[in-house]
C-alpha cells in the first residue's frame, strides 16, 4: 500500500515563489544530517518556520512555510529511522563501510559530524530508496519535568523527487505561533 506523509518546508519568500512557480524543490548539499535531498518536517509547520528562521537568519516577515504531500509508492523503499529494524540496518551498514570510509576521508572531514548523512548517501548510490525519515531532538528544548515524552521533531529527506506530489505544494496559511 502507498504511504502518504504531510510535510512542511520552510524557506525564504523569494525561494517559496520559485518553488510554487516551478513545482520543484532544490536539493540540499551532501553535508547534511540525512545526506543529499529535499528536507521537510512531518506534520509540523512550526518547526519548519523556526528552523529556516534560525538556519538562514531570516526575519518572521521573510519566512514562508510550504505544505507538501509526499507519496512513497508501494514498490519503493522508505528508510524509517523511527523503527528499530531500520536503525539497526543503517548502523550495521555503517560498520561494514567504516574501513572504506576511514581510508577515503580525512579525520577532519565533516563526515564525522554528520555520519548518518554520508552513510545514507552511500546506501542510496548502491540501493536507491525514496526517502528517509528520522526523529531529532528539538534544539534548546529540554524535556518538561514530570513528562516522559521526548521533545523531538520528525525530519524527512526526500531522495527521489518523484515522491513529491507537485500538485499539493502550497503556502501553509494557518497562523504559526512563534
Residues covered by each model-derived region:
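Cytochrome P450 catalytic domain signature, combining two hallmark sequence patches
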Residues: 26-27, 55-67
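A general structural signal for short secondary-structure junctions and capping/turn motifs
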Residues: 1, 29-32, 57-59, 144-148
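Extended catalytic/binding region for NAD+/ADP-ribose chemistry, centered on the ART fold
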Residues: 28-55
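Extracellular structured ligand-interaction cores
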Residues: 5, 35-38, 63-67
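ADP-ribose/NAD+-binding catalytic cleft of ART/PARP-like enzymes
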Residues: 1-33
Amino acid at each position: 500500500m502507498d504511504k502518504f506523509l504531510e510535510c512542511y518546508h520552510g524557506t525564504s519568500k523569494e525561494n517559496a515563489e520559485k518553488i510554487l512557480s516551478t513545482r520543484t524543490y532544490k536539493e540540499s548539499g551532501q553535508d547534511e544530517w540525512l545526506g543529499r535531498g529535499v528536507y521537510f518536517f512531518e506534520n509540523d509547520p512550526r518547526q519548519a518556520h523556526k528552523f529556516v528562521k534560525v538556519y538562514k537568519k531570516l526575519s518572521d516577515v521573510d519566512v514562508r512555510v510550504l505544505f507538501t504531500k509526499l507519496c512513497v509508492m508501494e514498490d519503493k523503499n522508505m528508510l524509517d529511522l523511527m523503527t528499530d529494524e531500520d536503525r539497526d540496518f543503517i548502523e550495521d551498514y555503517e560498520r561494514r563501510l567504516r574501513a572504506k570510509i576511514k581510508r577515503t576521508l580525512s579525520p577532519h572531514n565533516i563526515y564525522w559530524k554528520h555520519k548518518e548523512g554520508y552513510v545514507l548517501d552511500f546506501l542510496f548510490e548502491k540501493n536507491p530508496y525514496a526517502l528517509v525519515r528520522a526523529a531529532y531532538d528539538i534544539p534548546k528544548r529540554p524535556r518538561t519535568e514530570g513528562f516522559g515524552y521526548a521533545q523531538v521533531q520528525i525530519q524527512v529527506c526526500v531522495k527521489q523527487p518523484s515522491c513529491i506530489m507537485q500538485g499539493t505544494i502550497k503556502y501553509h496559511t494557518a497562523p504559526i505561533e512563534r
